[in-house]
C-alpha cells in the first residue's frame, strides 16, 4: 500500500545514524522527523482504509463559512523538492509576488544531498516558507499530499498541490487572492488548472537565467494539470497528484464551470482559459538528463517514463 525506501520501524537502527545527525541534524530534530514520518503514514493509512472500504464521504466541515461573503482568502501550496536549488528561489519569489500566503516545502533530498535552508533563509524567517524534513525517502508524494492537507486544512481557504516546475499563470495579472475571491468559485470544492507544457525550446545547456525567460514557447499538445482544493473538507483522500479528493462532486475549471465527473484530466483543457499552469517539465536536454538521474518523490532514478520522453 505504501512503499517507502526506508522502513520507519528500522530507521533508528541505521548504522550511519551518527553520521546523519552529525552532518546537519541534532537529536531533537531527528526525533521530530520520526514523528512527522509516523504521522504522515498514519494519516495516509487511515484515509486509504476508509477509501478502500467505500466509507469515505468528503464533506465541508460544520465550521464552513459563506464564501460568497468572504472578502479575504488564505492560500497555501504544498510542494516536494529534490535537487532543486537552481530553481527554488525563483519558484518561491514568483508565488510570493502573486500574493500566496505560505509554501509548505517538503525537503526530499538525499540524506547527504543539498539543503534549501541557506537559499531560502529570508523566506523561512518571514514564515513564508516552512520546510518539512522527508530526506532520503521515496514513493511518498501521495502520502505527503494527504498529510499536508490534513495538517493545514483548517488554516487555509485553498491549498494547492504543485511541483517546483509548475507556475500558476493568471492572465489578468491579478493576485491569486483576488482571482480566487470570485463568485464563480463559490460552489467549487476543487479548481483544476490545465498544464501548458514547455519543452527545451531548442536549448541544450543550462543557463543562469529565470525559467520564465528561458522557456517562452509552449508545445502544441497539453494534457493533465494540477489542482487547488478548498480547505475545511473532512475525510478528504487524495489518491494521486492530479485527482484531488475521492467523491468530490464540485470540481471546476479556471472559469468556475463544474467539469466533474467528466474525464477532466484529458478533456478539461480550455483554449480560452483565464488561468493555467506553466509546466516546465523537461527544461534543456542537459537539465532533463539530470532530472532522469535524480528521480523524485514519485518516480525513482532512471524511471522508464523519463526515458520514453527523452527518446521521443
What kind of region is each of these model predictions?
Residues 74-76:
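Cell-envelope/extracellular polymer assembly enzymes that use nucleotide-activated donors
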Residues 112-161, 169-170:
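Active-site-proximal specificity loops/subdomain of glycosyltransferases
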Residues 93-102:
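Short, acidic, metal-binding catalytic loop of nucleotide-sugar glycosyltransferases
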Residues 48-71:
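Conserved oxyanion/phosphate-binding beta-strand-loop segments in alpha/beta enzyme cores
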Residues 2-55, 142-143, 170-312:
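Catalytic-site signature of metal-activated, phosphate-bearing donor transferases
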Residues 102-107, 129-131:
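Short hydrophobic alpha-helical runs that function as membrane-insertion/retention elements
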Residues 79-93, 109:
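Active-site beta-to-alpha loop of glycosyltransferases that engages the nucleotide-sugar donor
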Amino acid at each position: 500500500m505504501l512503499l517507502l525506501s526506508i522502513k520507519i520501524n528500522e530507521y533508528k537502527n541505521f548504522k550511519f545514524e551518527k553520521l546523519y545527525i552529525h552532518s546537519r541534524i541534532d537529536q531533537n530534530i531527528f526525533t521530530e522527523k520520526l514523528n512527522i514520518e509516523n504521522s504522515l503514514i498514519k494519516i495516509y493509512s487511515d484515509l486509504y482504509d476508509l477509501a478502500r472500504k467505500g466509507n469515505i464521504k468528503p464533506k465541508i466541515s460544520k465550521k464552513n463559512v459563506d464564501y460568497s461573503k468572504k472578502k479575504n482568502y488564505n492560500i497555501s501550496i504544498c510542494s516536494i523538492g529534490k535537487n532543486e536549488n537552481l530553481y527554488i528561489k525563483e519558484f518561491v519569489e514568483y508565488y510570493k509576488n502573486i500574493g500566496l500566503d505560505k509554501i509548505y516545502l517538503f525537503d526530499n533530498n538525499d540524506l547527504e544531498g543539498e539543503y534549501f535552508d541557506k537559499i531560502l533563509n529570508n523566506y523561512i524567517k518571514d514564515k513564508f516558507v516552512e520546510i518539512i524534513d522527508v530526506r532520503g525517502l521515496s514513493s511518498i508524494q501521495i502520502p505527503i499530499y494527504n498529510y499536508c492537507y490534513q495538517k493545514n486544512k483548517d488554516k487555509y481557504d485553498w491549498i494547492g498541490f504543485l511541483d517546483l516546475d509548475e507556475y500558476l499563470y493568471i492572465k489578468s495579472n491579478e493576485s491569486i487572492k483576488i482571482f480566487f475571491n470570485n463568485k464563480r468559485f463559490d460552489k467549487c470544492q476543487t479548481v483544476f488548472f490545465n498544464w501548458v507544457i514547455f519543452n527545451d525550446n531548442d536549448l541544450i545547456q543550462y543557463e543562469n537565467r529565470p525559467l520564465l525567460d528561458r522557456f517562452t514557447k509552449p508545445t502544441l499538445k497539453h494534457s493533465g494539470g494540477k489542482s487547488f482544493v478548498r480547505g475545511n473538507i473532512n475525510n478528504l483522500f487524495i489518491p494521486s497528484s492530479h485527482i484531488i479528493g475521492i467523491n468530490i462532486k464540485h470540481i471546476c475549471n479556471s472559469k468556475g464551470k463544474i467539469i466533474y465527473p467528466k474525464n477532466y484530466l484529458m478533456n478539461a483543457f480550455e483554449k480560452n482559459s483565464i488561468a493555467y499552469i506553466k509546466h516546465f517539465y523537461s527544461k534543456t536536454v542537459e537539465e532533463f538528463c539530470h532530472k532522469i538521474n535524480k528521480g523524485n518523490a514519485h518516480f525513482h532514478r532512471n524511471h522508464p517514463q523519463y526515458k520514453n520522453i527523452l527518446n521521443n
